Structures are given as C-alpha cells and as structure tokens.
C-alpha cells in the first residue's frame, strides 16, 4: 500500500524475527506511492515559495494511534504537502482536520492503485473531495495528497535556472 517496505509495513518486526532465528534476508526498496502518485499527476510536490516539505502520514482508524503531536491538525500548521496513506475511508475526518489551515480551495489529489492498470486519479479541493471519493466508491488502496503545490499554476520558478543565479557552471558576469 505504500510501495516501499520501509513505509507503513511490518518489515521491522519481520526483520527482527528473521534476525532472532539467524535467517538471512535482503531488503529490496520499492517506489514509494507518493513518488509514483506525483509522476501520475505530472506534478512536483515541492515548489519554491509554496512548499519545500513533504510529510508522509496517516490517520488513526482501527490501527495504532498516532503519536502525540502527529495528528493532521498539527501537521497542517506547517503548510507542507501532505501524503496521507491508509486513510481514504477516513476522508471526511481528513477534510475536517485540514480545512482550517489549508482552506476549502486547497488542491487535493486522490490516487487509487497508483501504477496499476486500473489506476484512477481524482483532482479536487478540500471542499469537494469527500463527495467525489464517495461517488467513485474508493474505499481502499488510495493515497491522498494535499497542498498548494498540487496547483500547477502556483509558485515561482526555481532560482537555479535564473540568469542571475551564480553557481559552479554559471559564473558571475563581469562588467
């Protein structure tokens, strides 16, 4: 569900058991769902002057509780792009927790079964997304991305490519 064994998997406990019995194993990295979703959306998750951070998180449902301070309400105060795993059935609570900080017009993308042949993408706003998820009957295997960086018209150009930006391959013009 996350694309990589190190994110929201049980790999830690599995490796501890294998280690205890001295069973050799290899950890093979995967493509994280948030990165695959960004590719499917053809978008950047970090944009200068908009968001320079991506937070990977989830909501507490039937699984373990969230550690103190890691609730969506707290994370939303950062303004970072959020990649919310394992929470599509909790979409109404996600919207309620994020709307005060991000606003009803904040872009949201829900990517169902990213990289699979039946992949589906919903692009919307915090105001509309819960209804669209319900109408699409998405109940599992969907990643929720939230943040101003998801708006393709938002943000400024990277200073890296500015003619005024001096770096190793672009020296300061004399005179």
Regions found by a protein language model. Give the residues of each.
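Short glycine-cluster motifs
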Residues: 1-61
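A contiguous loop/helix-start segment that scaffolds small-molecule binding in enzyme catalytic cores
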Residues: 5, 10, 15-16, 51-53, ...
């Amino acid at each position: 569900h996350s694309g990589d064994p190190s994110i929201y998997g049980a790999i830690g406990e599995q490796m501890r058991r294998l280690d205890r019995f001295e069973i050799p194993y290899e950890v093979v990295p995967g493509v994280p769902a948030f990165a695959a979703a960004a590719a499917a959306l053809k978008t950047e998750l970090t944009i200068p002057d908009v968001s320079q951070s991506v937070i990977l998180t989830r909501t507490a449902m039937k699984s373990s509780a969230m550690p103190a301070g890691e609730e969506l309400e707290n994370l939303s105060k950062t303004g970072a792009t959020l990649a919310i795993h394992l929470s599509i059935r909790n979409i109404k609570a996600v919207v309620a927790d994020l709307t005060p900080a991000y606003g009803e017009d904040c872009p949201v993308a829900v990517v169902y079964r990213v990289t699979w042949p039946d992949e589906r993408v919903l692009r919307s706003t915090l105001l509309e997304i819960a209804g669209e998820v319900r109408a699409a009957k998405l109940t599992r295997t969907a990643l929720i991305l939230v943040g101003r960086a998801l708006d393709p018209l938002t943000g400024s150009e990277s200073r890296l490519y500015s003619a005024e930006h001096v770096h190793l391959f672009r020296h300061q013009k004399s005179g």
